[in-house]
C-alpha cells in the first residue's frame, strides 16, 4: 500500500512540532550555566562554561529538608530547584520543587507553560486536580492524595493543590523543564501590569465591573 509523500511530510512536520514543545535534548554530556558571556557558549537560554572547568558544586543544591514559610495569603510555599539554583541542570530538561502547605492552605490554580509535573505527597492530605482544554470540554480530573500517592499534571493544564487536613502537608514535584515557568491564574488576570480593562474582565467572567475593580485592587502588584 503506497503512502503519499504529502502524508509523510505532514507526519514529519507534526513530529518536529512536538519535539520543539519541550526542552531540546543536549548534544553534550552537560552544559553548566554561567552568567559570563565572555567565557561561554549560549545554549538553551544560558551561557555554558568550559566543560573542563565544571565541578561537583555545579550539580548540587541543599536545603530541601527545610520547610518553606507558609505565612502568606494562600498559606503555601514553593521552594524551586531549577537551572538558577543548579547551573548543571542547563539543557537537561528537568527541575524539582518542594511545596509546603499550612492546614487548609493551597497552591492556587496555575499552569506551567513549559513542563509536565509529577507530584508525590510525603506528608498530609491533599486534594489535587487539573482541568483539560476547551476541546475536551474543560473536564476536571481530581483526586485526594495520601502520603506516597502520585499525581501527574500535563503540560500547560491549569492545576491546583489544596491541603484538606488539619496538619501541614509536604509534597515534592518533578518538572520536565530546566525552567518550567509558572502562571498563577488569579495573579495574572487580575494583577497584570498594566491592568486589563475591567470592562473586558467583567464581560469575560460575567461579573459586575465593580467586583472586577475590587479584585484588581486585591491582586495589584
From Swiss-Prot:
<feature type="binding site">
    <location>
        <position position="159"/>
    </location>
    <ligand>
        <name>Mn(2+)</name>
    </ligand>
</feature>
<keyword id="KW-0464">Manganese</keyword>
<keyword id="KW-0732">Signal</keyword>
<keyword id="KW-0479">Metal-binding</keyword>
<comment type="similarity">
    <text>Belongs to the germin family.</text>
</comment>
<feature type="binding site">
    <location>
        <position position="117"/>
    </location>
    <ligand>
        <name>Mn(2+)</name>
    </ligand>
</feature>
<feature type="signal peptide">
    <location>
        <begin position="1"/>
        <end position="21"/>
    </location>
</feature>
<dbReference type="Pfam" id="PF00190">
    <property type="entry name" value="Cupin_1"/>
</dbReference>
<dbReference type="InterPro" id="IPR006045">
    <property type="entry name" value="Cupin_1"/>
</dbReference>
<dbReference type="GO" id="GO:0048046">
    <property type="term" value="C:apoplast"/>
</dbReference>
<protein>
    <recommendedName>
        <fullName>Germin-like protein subfamily 1 member 17</fullName>
    </recommendedName>
</protein>
<dbReference type="InterPro" id="IPR011051">
    <property type="entry name" value="RmlC_Cupin_sf"/>
</dbReference>
<keyword id="KW-0325">Glycoprotein</keyword>
<dbReference type="InterPro" id="IPR001929">
    <property type="entry name" value="Germin"/>
</dbReference>
<dbReference type="InterPro" id="IPR019780">
    <property type="entry name" value="Germin_Mn-BS"/>
</dbReference>
<feature type="binding site">
    <location>
        <position position="112"/>
    </location>
    <ligand>
        <name>Mn(2+)</name>
    </ligand>
</feature>
<dbReference type="InterPro" id="IPR014710">
    <property type="entry name" value="RmlC-like_jellyroll"/>
</dbReference>
<feature type="glycosylation site" description="N-linked (GlcNAc...) asparagine">
    <location>
        <position position="77"/>
    </location>
</feature>
<keyword id="KW-0964">Secreted</keyword>
<keyword id="KW-0052">Apoplast</keyword>
<comment type="function">
    <text>May play a role in plant defense. Probably has no oxalate oxidase activity even if the active site is conserved.</text>
</comment>
<feature type="domain" description="Cupin type-1">
    <location>
        <begin position="76"/>
        <end position="213"/>
    </location>
</feature>
<feature type="disulfide bond">
    <location>
        <begin position="31"/>
        <end position="48"/>
    </location>
</feature>
<keyword id="KW-1015">Disulfide bond</keyword>
<feature type="binding site">
    <location>
        <position position="110"/>
    </location>
    <ligand>
        <name>Mn(2+)</name>
    </ligand>
</feature>
<dbReference type="GO" id="GO:0030145">
    <property type="term" value="F:manganese ion binding"/>
</dbReference>
<comment type="subunit">
    <text>Oligomer (believed to be a pentamer but probably hexamer).</text>
</comment>
